Amino acid sequence: MPGVPEYLRLAEENNGIGSVAGDTVLITVPPESLRSIAGKMFNEFKAVFRTCAGVDERPLNNHFSIIHLFTDDKAGLYIAVKSYLQPEHPVAPSISDIVPAADWCELEAWDLLGIEFEGRVLRRLVLPDWWPQGVHPLRKDFKYDEKPPVAIARSEKLGLREEAGTVPLGPYHPALHEPEYFELYVKGERVVDVKYRGFNVHRGIEKLAESRMNYQQVNFLAERICGICGFEHSTCYALAVEKAAGIEVPERAQYIRSIVLELERIHSHLLWLGVAFHLLGYDAGFMHMWRIREKAMILAEMLTGSRKTYGINLVGGVRRDVSEEKKSRVLSELRELESDFKKVVEIALSTPHVKKRLTGTGVLPREDAWRLGVEGPVARASGIDRDARRDLPYAAYKHASFKVPVYTEGDNMARALVRVMEVYESISIIEQLLDKLPKGPLMAERVEIPPGRVGVQVVEAPRGGDIHFVMTGDGRPYRWRVRAPTYANIPALKVMLRDQYLADAPVTLASIDPCFSCTDRVVLVRENGVAERFTLGVGL
């Protein structure tokens, strides 16, 4: 198993330099070494590719840079592989043929920063068709409130399959809760191909944060990335900044973060189970799951002042404490929730038509799950034993004992069972942390954030790993990159839907628990009706 020495040696072998800061290894190599180092890390070291971030560093050192972010979950390490690129014409070699999951973030870096990637087709991904060519909004010379002239729209035609029927799904559809567009190609009752077009509500939060917000204000922006797992995003951002600045967060604040994170996981999974039962026509299960979920929402409001757990995190700690009275009530309500949930979910998953519709449908083989870099319950249902709470521990998770449920079937039932078992584990984690909750302050004594530092953090959200990359600047992030787990999971739908009955498409789509507000920029392209190409970008 590789460790820090092996990664530092890898940097030297590729004409680069390596350095270590805490749990992060930074490897800086010339662009021509990127493919070699990415291949060894992905294929030999089995490092997990998380995302990449383009950065306009011209005001700092007259260069652009591209940073590929990996994690070595067995060693508990973050590995950032960085290359500096020329300021006039930034070009880097593509690694997407070696690491398929890199396809998406390369396209995003091209679209938003104008970084070209040799050896691949570059397509407009995030920006609308009317956006003028050559204008890249994440460059530092583009002002956040600038309105570029409207160019003539050049809509891209995504080659239809003439031999198959077309079934549009969205952008507004009862099976979708946000505006997205799926185009299913069918022969008879079977799905043979899928096209996906999103990007309808891109909000440009990275540019907003880098342009006009201070570090603490970004917390409140981060938690609004997602309507379900906002606390995961604000925690991930805060941890990344704290790591970059070397801020020691009080232990009590770390415990409170983990408690709220697990409460959010419970209500998210209960919401998903209810939606899944509704899509299967089992509305009794839907009603009961949402009835039980209401207990979690009441606890969230009691602990945080909001059913949506907003306004808790700050860089350096948390804003609300947990009293002894609240501890007692949480423990009592969770015991009742667990008992109620156990009765309902056992009945629901043994209901014949629910069991039949979930078992054997939407299968994602393990090799495809690894190749595409899927996250969370989608990965664990396909036999990939990965969970950042255990592998890359943060907040107070090192003080809790829990199991990571893993199934090998890779079908819709396995993804449901992962979430069911995680509800039980989350209840156990909250009980353990409340029992051990230490005394002490809620905020670090000093919160000083020097410029020029880098922090990378993964937080295991209900849907999988949230990744936040922060390069510190003067009073605000110089670069903030966000990658939501749905970003990694949507491309797997092409595999999961292939050869499935059209009637099973909605529940298979829902089985990844997609959050389009987190991800909302995906295209699935079939070139010339033959060659397949995934393209997706998510920088929020």
Model-derived segments and spans:
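Catalytic cofactor-binding cores of redox enzymes
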Residues: 131-191, 195-540
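Terminal low-complexity/charged segments
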Residues: 1-194, 268, 353-361, 368, ...
